[in-house]
Regions:
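Conserved aromatic-histidine-acidic binding/catalytic patches
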Residues: 15, 64, 82
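Short, flexible active-site loops
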Residues: 7-12, 57-60, 76
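A boundary/linker detector
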Residues: 1-26, 31, 46-47, 106-140
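Histidine-centered nuclease catalytic patch
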Residues: 39-71
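Short Cys/His-centered divalent metal-binding micro-motifs
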Residues: 48, 72-99
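Short metal-coordination and nucleic-acid-contact micro-motifs, chiefly zinc-binding Cys/His arrays
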Residues: 20-23, 30-39, 68-72
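Short microdomains enriched in Cys/His and/or Lys/Arg
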Residues: 60-72, 95-108
Length: 140
């Protein structure tokens, strides 16, 4: 009798790639208008959702905030990559959007070491896949 091969579990790096992609898609959907246009929060440029990027206030290397919706906003490539997201303007934007104490807390917590477990990455993938589906239902 032939052996039945078990499905391989995805590697951690594959889960991170998938979570990044799905979360980024959600952020761009969340921050676009009903015509699929995103307004960059730093320079106010209007760009198509598909060309927008997911800008992290606290960098993605900080796992605690990598998938935190309050840390991420859709914006243009110029501000995110070329200008390296202009930290001063982004900080002011964050302080206006939330409050100074919240921004200070995020900055202070960003120094803490936090590693997401495999099941947490799977939960993130499932959560934001569902949120994307809800947006799709609302816009169709």
């Amino acid at each position: 009798m032939p052996k039945v091969k078990k499905a391989k579990k995805p590697t951690r790096s594959k889960l991170v790639q998938k979570a990044d992609s799905i979360f980024s898609t959600y952020i761009r959907l969340r921050d676009s208008n009903n015509k699929g246009i995103v307004t960059c929060p730093l320079c106010w440029a209007k760009i198509p959702r598909k060309k927008a990027q997911n800008m992290h206030f606290i960098t993605r290397s900080c796992w605690l905030y990598r998938y935190d919706e309050s840390n991420c906003f859709a914006g243009c490539m110029r501000c995110n990559v070329i200008l390296n997201w202009n930290y001063i303007i982004y900080t002011r934007f964050m302080q206006d959007k939330f409050w100074i104490e919240k921004v200070d807390e995020m900055i202070n917590n960003s120094k803490k070491i936090h590693k997401l477990q495999t099941f947490e990455l799977e939960d993130i993938i499932n959560l934001y896949t569902e949120k994307i589906k809800k947006y799709a239902r609302l816009t169709t």
